């Protein structure tokens, strides 16, 4: 997973922000995207833990070491597929989740943890930019209807899964 000694060679990098004076004039994204090379380095910081506690720290059970490794190896589309295997809406969670996975990261015991939330966010951004994310329209509608109570991530995920 990642680079064998990436956690030693690469320092943690976080997103930088647009100055407040500029961002109060619009509703655009206020973070500045790191370069793909920098994101790949951050993926390389993943240590290939024997027991990846980031997994259990993630409420969705995302395959974090796997998508970090894919990003490090420049396999962005594969990283997106890995992310979508456990997360219906990473475009939301990459922005809204408080990232308990980072608090559970083993590297965080001695150094700043892997930038998991940032990597997740930009995997999805890359997916939209490259056109890899498309609407999943069912081939045939059954005509049946169902109600999903709740409009949070779980309710939206249930609605998406039931629509397929």
Positions of the model-derived regions?
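Ferredoxin-type iron-sulfur electron-transfer modules and their immediate structural context
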Residues: 1-145
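N-terminal Rossmann-like FAD-binding beta1-loop-alpha1 element of flavoenzymes
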Residues: 144-164
């Amino acid at each position: 997973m990642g680079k064998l000694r990436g956690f030693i060679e690469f320092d943690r990098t976080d997103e930088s922000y647009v100055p407040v004076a500029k961002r109060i004039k619009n509703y655009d994204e206020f973070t500045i995207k790191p370069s793909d090379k920098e994101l790949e380095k951050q993926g390389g910081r993943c240590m290939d833990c024997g027991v990846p506690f980031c997994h259990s720290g993630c409420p969705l059970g995302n395959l974090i070491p796997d998508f970090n490794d894919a990003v490090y190896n420049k396999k962005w589309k594969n990283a997106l597929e890995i992310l979508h295997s456990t997360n219906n809406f990473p475009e939301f969670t990459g922005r809204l989740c408080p990232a308990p996975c980072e608090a559970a990261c083993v590297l965080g015991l001695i150094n700043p943890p892997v930038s998991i939330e940032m990597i997740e966010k930009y995997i999805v951004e890359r997916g939209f930019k490259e056109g890899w994310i498309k609407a999943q329209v069912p081939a045939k509608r059954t005509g049946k209807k169902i109600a999903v109570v709740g409009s949070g991530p779980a309710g939206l995920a249930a609605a998406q899964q039931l629509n397929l």
